[in-house]
Amino acid sequence: MMGVTTTLNEDTEPSIPPGFGPFATLPLWGIHNDAKPAVTHSTPVQALQSIRKDSEECQPSAAVSRSDTPCSTSGTQTCRKSLRNRPPIDYSRFEHISDEDSDVEIVEKDVSSTRRRQQLPKGVLRGCAECSDCQKVIAKWNPAGARRPVLDEAPVFYPTEEEFEDTLKYIESIRPMAEPYGICRIVPPSSWKPPCLLKDKSIWEGSKFSTRVQKVDKLQNRKSSKKGRRGGMMKRRKLAESEENSATAHTQTGMQQSPERFGFEPGPEFTLQTFQKYADDFSKQYFRKDTSMDSVPSVEDIEGEYWRIVEVPTEEIEVIYGADLETGTFGSGFPKLSPETKSDAEDKYAQSGWNLNNLPRLQGSVLSFEGGDISGVLVPWVYVGMCFSSFCWHVEDHHLYSLNYMHWGAPKLWYGVPGKDAVNLESAMRKHLPELFEEQPDLLHNLVTQFSPSLLKSEGVHVYRCVQHEGEFVLTFPRAYHAGFNCGFNCAEAVNVAPIDWLPIGHNAVELYREQARKITISHDKLLLGAAREAIRAQWDILFLKRNTADNMRWKSICGADSTIFKALKARIETELVQRKTLGVPAQSRKMDAEFDSIDRECALCYYDLHLSASGCPCCPEKYACLVHAKQLCSCDWDKRFFLFRYDVNELNILADALGGKLSAIHRWGVSDLGLSLSSCVKREKVQDSKTVRRLTDGPRRSYMSQASAVSLVSSSTSNEQKDEGNKIMKIASPQTNNVCPSVEQRKSENISPLKEPCVRNELSCTTNSDSNGLQYNGGLGGHKGSAPGLPVSSSPSFSSNVATRPISTSSVSMKIVQGLVASKSCIQASSRTGDSRSLLGEHHNRSPAMIHDGTNMKSSLESSNNSCRLIASDYNATPCHSSKDQVLVTPGTNASVVTLKDSSQVHSASSQQFVRTGPWTQSASHEASSPSTSALKPSLDPPAMKNLYGGFTQGSAHPGPPSFSNQQPNDGRLQRTSESLPGVEARARGHPTVTAQPALEIHSRNGGAQKGPRIANVVHRFKCSVEPLEIGVVLSGRLWSSSQAIFPKGFRSRVKYFSIVDPIQMAYYISEILDAGMQGPLFMVKLENCPGEVFINLSPTKCWNMVRERLNMEIRRQLNMGKSNLPTLQPPGSVDGLEMFGLLSPPIVQAIWARDRDHICTEYWRSRPHVLIEDPNNRHMLSQGPPLLALRGLIQRANRDELQVLRSLMTNSNNLDDSSRQQAAHIIEEEIAKQLC
């Protein structure tokens, strides 16, 4: 021990290590006979391993000797020298190993890493007494210690001008090549140079932004700290939410403000001008090798120095980063569409799909179905960086795509890991940073931890490098981890996008979030269902309206049973059904209100999205849970729990079938859920009627199932509390409409939010359970419930019902007047064979009928004991049915009628192919006085007379012009109550009596009830119209372009005045137009002149105007419910004739159309008028073609060009035909006739 005299200041090494003095005379390898000398180590690695083992064994001895030996307190350098002073080891063999690569150094850092990290000297001194945005850089670039990772490069793509036009299509095209890398670079065409608005002087010098202070040396190597500052990730949130709500959400999962977490402290505010000065000053000071010259490092030099600082720091390096700057406040670098657009170039870039302000909501991105502006997801973020400012390893929220564009500046280095290696990256980081993950299990969600790509690569994780330059895009793929840093001052902008292929990945993301109890950013179910509904809408437009637009074709191309969206929807439905089945049969199930998730609704336990379903309890009205955690919501009895479902099981199945391309499902979903506002379902119902072909269509009308009444999935008894809730929900089922005309004030009801699209139909939803014979209807009229135990229910029920218009064809009909519209059992069974019929339940005081509709059967839930009929609602006019088959309709001119079982049987015996438009069943005043409550009227009408009664024209009609009414006031446009109408006159001319109906409301009033609600005329009057032709159009051949009544010229336009559907008190002009629907023939369109948003389209002119009439009646009812007076009476069926309203029966217009068809190419029309005289310009009269010539014309139309030329040569030159040739031609014709007879 006396030989140990080394002090802290001695430079010479001691002859023997401290503490080994007494054993100095003994060789180390002589202690055991079987020991080998240390010099036998064959490699430096083996020697280093021996040193590491010896150093661990020496630690206790060194601790004991520290109090006795001055050397033990010397620092790491002295300890290192003592460890190297071992006679058996030749240390000269390791002198060539640098300090950075030495394993000895690594061992020493492991021993005293905490002390060394705490003792790192300051490399950057930021701020002073006078300002906070100045700096002094003490640390210097160390090229010798560079630790640049050896990685493969991510792919780079150079789209052409044509490829660059469609953003999502191009991303889809490169996905198979780029997704295996997780990241790629896209270099736009050289001509694409958008202006950067952030360089405007007002923003450059005047707009300040907040920054973060990043300690680069602690991004990877730091101790698990119990004290820290806020986290580095800002939670994506909606811009529209209030500051209070924003702050709350921000505290919960946004900027991690917990004092137990490591994070980035806030830095000073900068403008772009001052930040550039600060960033350039840092780079200049840090990379200056000496005072005599400046050095400009390459990207590779900066990369090597960055990872040296992260992995083996020697000084504390602080940098500033302006990250996550909301473009909504700071501004975007891309131009936006506005009236202030200065040039065509700006307008071009403002509309570009590569403009990050447009990208998330492009057609084909499911983010377009998110209504709110979510900062960072749908609203881009701006990033202003300097050298070494970093973005740490992370994936995008919900595993979305992200697109980053660099506006200007130094390169940005990216590192990407493909989605298939995401789990491997997480495992590798947990393995090497266990303390950090123990403290923060969600460490990777906070963007505060960097990790060496070299270490990831050594763990088998695929990592790729990408260098982004000014004017280039970087695209990251779903669940692809990425990180990086900036090489100097630059500015970039980024946003998310979600093509259809993201949907299954997004579903996995939200399920993962549920497991992690992590807050969501977007509603995945809302996006999925929104995309599915839009895809079905596109298929509707293509299949029924022949609108083969680019957008529609894009959506159609992604549909089908093998499509991604179909599989994603099926997977989500299966998950939902499993969860519902797990719950068993819920005691109380309700229809989810449309606005339920207008505010963010999340599971109180796992934060799962509640767009599709939710569970709740009366004890906590503002607290809901997902179906998985329904039992954990509260401690109340299970019977008190209620469940909200946006769609029932059958509706979800119909949605899936429609998305898969099933035509009937597309039709059902389009009618019931979409309610297309600008068109009707263009379907053809061809009905033969004495050589007349009529085309009928189903007209979809705006409806919102989400505004329906409460739904019970099974038959069960409910508590009074449930009944009160049903009554409360029922209030939302009152008739409502909405006008999209900007000049019209949007109407709102107390319990109904305004509809987002034009509405021409209202409905109640009534859902059945195919597993039960009973049915429960929550919230009948007036809030009452009706039950129908024992009624058979179809296995494929529909999810809404509307009063349907069904044509009736019969030679004898028995009508009775009762309170309410009553349909017989037989009539209902007849209608059940028509397919997808609908019903609309209307409110009426003191009555609460309920009706169910199962898609094939329509049955009421209340029995009428007196008449053996089933009662359904009565207060609404009938509306067009939705079926491709022939329907049966009883449409009285009043709100009340009944068809007995016996009478209805006669309906079935009538021809199902005959269509008769709704007509004016009327009753005289004297007769109604004698029968105040019920009267049996049996008019004997044959089918031809009945057709004429309903507004048709007979074959013998010599003049197609409209009739006039002497009892109507001129030009007032209102219906007047007169003793007879046109149908009555026509019926009397044929010897049939006129039947007048008594309104149910008046009967109810006479019986003591209060007379409320809209009035309907006792006598149906044809509306007297004066049509102004705007354009005659062009006549086309083909049977679809004419009928026995009128010719339908393509491009025909006319103008007529009728009650305004916006304000029924006023009259308004309507524009009627005939369009070309291709194979479907003519398409009839009517629109309100001063409100282009109100458009009605159908393949039948009469049904087209009937849609206008029904829309008018709905508005009258709505305004009447609001207490308005001086409203016109409800317009009954038959009050308007589509052909007349179009002007196609007006004599002047008819003459003009005839002039366009001098060759009589409209054969359907002229076949019924073989002797009509047409005046030519030379005042000569030409006789119309007779049947032989018409037959010849049909033959000629089927001939090809060569055959027509030969025929013309034969007919014009008599010399070509002698008697022999004529005989041969006749013989050939006779042979062909004989063949056809055989």
Swiss-Prot record:
Comp. bias regions, Basic residues: 221-238
Cellular localisation: Nucleus
Region spans: Disordered: 56-79, 215-266, 699-725, 777-798, 834-863, 910-978
EC primary class: oxidoreductase
Domain JmjC: 348-514
Domain JmjN residues, every copy: 154-195
Null allele phenotype: Semi-dwarf plants and reduced seed size. Small panicle enclosure phenotype.
Keywords: Chromatin regulator, Dioxygenase, Iron, Metal-binding, Nucleus, Oxidoreductase, Transcription, Transcription regulation
GO cellular component assignments: chromatin; nucleus
Biological process per Gene Ontology, one example term: negative regulation of gene expression, epigenetic
Name of the protein described by the UniProt record: Lysine-specific demethylase JMJ703
Phenotype when changing residue 376 to A: Loss of activity on H3K4me3/2/1
Domain FYR C-terminal: residue ranges: 1079-1169
Function of the protein: Histone demethylase that demethylates 'Lys-4' (H3K4me) of histone H3 with a specific activity for H3K4me3, H3K4me2 and H3K4me1. No activity on H3K9me3/2/1, H3K27me3/2/1 and H3K36me3/2/1. Involved in the control of stem elongation by regulating methylation states of H3K4me3 on cytokinin oxidase (CKX) gene family, which may cause increased expression of CKX genes and reduced cytokinin levels. Prevents ectopic retrotransposition by regulating the levels of H3K4me3 in two non-LTR retrotransposons KARMA and LINE-1 (L1) and reinforcing their repressed states.
Organism listed in the record: Oryza sativa subsp. japonica
Gene3D superfamilies according to UniProt: 3.30.160.360, Cupin (2.60.120.650)
GO molecular function, one term: histone H3K4 demethylase activity
Classification via PROSITE patterns: FYRC, FYRN, JMJC, JMJN
Name of the gene encoding the protein in the UniProt record: JMJ703
Listed EC numbers: 1.14.11.67
Catalysed reactions, semicolon-separated: N(6),N(6),N(6)-trimethyl-L-lysyl(4)-[histone H3] + 3 2-oxoglutarate + 3 O2 = L-lysyl(4)-[histone H3] + 3 formaldehyde + 3 succinate + 3 CO2
